[in-house]
UniProtKB/Swiss-Prot annotation:
It is found in: Nucleus. PANTHER family: HISTONE H1, HMG-Y-RELATED PROTEIN A. This is HMG-Y-related protein A. SUPFAM superfamilies: Winged helix' DNA-binding domain. Signal peptide: none annotated. One of its GO terms (cellular component) is nucleosome. It comes from the Eukaryota. GO terms for biological process: chromosome condensation; negative regulation of DNA recombination; nucleosome assembly; regulation of DNA-templated transcription.
Length: 176
């Protein structure tokens, strides 16, 4: 157990904090590129866990407006610059309500609960469909073995497709 505590690397400060300190320390007029930032962090804080983590944090900070990105260089965002506008159409301005009006709370989501004190509803009469037949597949009627169904009288023609008519061979005599 004691060896685990000795071998633990020193804890690093959060990436955004390291990146901001790096940009302040490098203090380049046109900003610093990703490789310069990673080299400075490695020399100052030692080995980094993963190189891709730095890139993802730089992108997050760029998207949130903490950093500005120009010509492949990162620099601290100007505090006087207006905030970046979000995507899409901005919402319409809301018209102010006249004073004294009571705003009702919005309706809750979902189906409202049933009233426990309400009288039970009378059961509905089932609507019969247009035909007198019941829904679904009809029930199988079991046949009794004693009663044999009379077979249909055959008309002399067999069931199915008739066989193909073959031409009769005629005898041809060959005289020479």
């Amino acid at each position: 157990m004691a060896t685990e505590e000795v071998n633990k690397p020193q804890s690093l400060p959060p990436y955004p904090e390291m990146i901001v300190k790096t940009l302040e320390a490098l203090n380049e007029p046109n900003g610093s590129n990703k490789s310069a930032i990673s080299k400075y962090i490695e020399t100052t804080y030692g080995e980094l866990p993963d190189a891709t983590v730095l890139g993802s944090h730089l992108n997050k900070m760029k998207d949130s407006g903490e950093l500005s990105f120009k010509q492949n260089n990162y620099m601290k965002a100007d505090p006087n610059a207006p905030p970046k506008r979000g995507r899409g159409r901005p919402p319409k301005p809301k018209t102010p309500l006249p004073p004294g009006t009571v705003v009702s709370p919005p309706r809750p989501r979902g189906r409202p609960p049933k009233d426990p004190n309400a009288p039970p509803k009378s059961p509905k009469a089932k609507a019969t469909p247009g035909s007198g037949r019941p829904r679904g597949r009809p029930k199988k009627v079991p046949r009794s073995p004693a009663v044999a169904a009379p077979t249909a009288v055959s008309s002399g023609r067999p069931r199915g497709r008739p066989p193909k008519v073959k031409p009769q061979l005629t005898e041809v005599s060959v005289e020479s």
